[in-house]
Amino acid sequence: MRIAVSGGGTGGHIYPALAFIKEVQRRHPDVEFLYIGTENGLEKKIVERENIPFRAIEITGFKRKLSFENVKTVMRFLKGVKKSKSYLKEFKPDAVIGTGGYVCGPVVYAAAKMGIPTIIHEQNSLPGITNKFLSKYVNKVAICFEEAKSHFPAEKVVFTGNPRASEVVSIKTGRSLTEFGLKDNQKTVLIFGGSRGAAPINRAVIDMQEELKTRPYQVLYITGEVHYEKVTAELKGGKAADNMVTKPFLHQMPEYLQSIDVIVARAGATTIAEITALGIPSVLIPSPYVTANHQEVNAKALSQHDAAIVLKETELSGEKLIAALDKIVMNEETLKDMSERTKSLGVPDAAARLYSIMEDIKK
């Protein structure tokens, strides 16, 4: 069996693709994969690290206003389609899966026009331009939020959830927080502003550090590598709380999530998939800098079920953040109830569901 995969730009498009690849490899050890992305994108480094064959096309995203740059983007798209067709003719895949980001546009479009069975996977509640365009041509559209359904042809839509969920629940033995000098037997909050960090979240944490010193819970705080030196300097200036450990980045984060009681994070699709799969209550701070404000819609999908507290970035402060944490962590009943509600929204078998759709369209 041969499968071509495309998706990139951000980890939110790449990690679901890798989780799906692992699921297929588990079922078919002799499967062959080809990943098509961009030369300069995040996907190249991540995919090649996993020893998956990688081919590149040149493509950029559309600007959301009329510009000459969009004319060039159309030209790159057409060139990308031509290049993708040559890769696909050579590889001869049984199916092609696109996981979003503009890079998968030419690849999946080319595959559909060649009559190869195709699926797109939409991680967010509000779909991006690329997947909306591709939905007219593909066999199936896999979604992670019911809110996304209305944006696609109804007869093509299948709810699968995000394969990243399957990956985090498959980790049987998590790693100990004692690696960071934290206690294994104490309630723990993970604060994480995304791979690049988030300055407004960092400011709120700095502002709440004095209050945090009096709390019976501990914090593992990931600043993002760009912000680490500045943040740690400010924290030390305020004599950082003993019950908080600060790190620039956390590699293999899923391996630590089983030891976390509450998470403070953005509301990206991958984060939502991970916390719902494991039943981790959350304080979500949606990024206002994303397309169509989709993170706010992602967050609402949890908060409307009382599975998360949502704080808007414009209203964020140290006082509000620690109050939200106290509300969850300091009340055992609330913590348990939110954990159950969060877990009820998870789809731990998402990768298997996506695999099943692929098998169906191949027939």
Swiss-Prot record:
Catalytic reactions on record: di-trans,octa-cis-undecaprenyl diphospho-N-acetyl-alpha-D-muramoyl-L-alanyl-D-glutamyl-meso-2,6-diaminopimeloyl-D-alanyl-D-alanine + UDP-N-acetyl-alpha-D-glucosamine = di-trans,octa-cis-undecaprenyl diphospho-[N-acetyl-alpha-D-glucosaminyl-(1->4)]-N-acetyl-alpha-D-muramoyl-L-alanyl-D-glutamyl-meso-2,6-diaminopimeloyl-D-alanyl-D-alanine + UDP + H(+)
Membrane topology, from the record: Peripheral membrane protein
Binding-site residues, UDP-N-acetyl-alpha-D-glucosamine: T10, G11, G12, N124, S195, Q295
Species: Bacillus velezensis (strain DSM 23117 / BGSC 10A6 / LMG 26770 / FZB42)
Compartments (UniProt record): Cell membrane
Pathway: Cell wall biogenesis; peptidoglycan biosynthesis
Family membership noted in the UniProt record: Belongs to the glycosyltransferase 28 family. MurG subfamily.
Name of the featured protein: UDP-N-acetylglucosamine--N-acetylmuramyl-(pentapeptide) pyrophosphoryl-undecaprenol N-acetylglucosamine transferase
Keywords assigned: Cell cycle, Cell division, Cell membrane, Cell shape, Cell wall biogenesis/degradation, Glycosyltransferase, Membrane, Peptidoglycan synthesis, Transferase
One GO term (biological process): lipid glycosylation
Main location: membrane
Keyword Ion transport belongs to the record: no
GO CC annotations on file: plasma membrane
InterPro entries per UniProt: GlcNAc_MurG, Glyco_trans_28_C, GlycoTrans_28_N
EC number, as in UniProt: 2.4.1.227
Lineage top rank: taxon: Bacteria
GO MF term (any one): undecaprenyldiphospho-muramoylpentapeptide beta-N-acetylglucosaminyltransferase activity
Entry function: Cell wall formation. Catalyzes the transfer of a GlcNAc subunit on undecaprenyl-pyrophosphoryl-MurNAc-pentapeptide (lipid intermediate I) to form undecaprenyl-pyrophosphoryl-MurNAc-(pentapeptide)GlcNAc (lipid intermediate II).
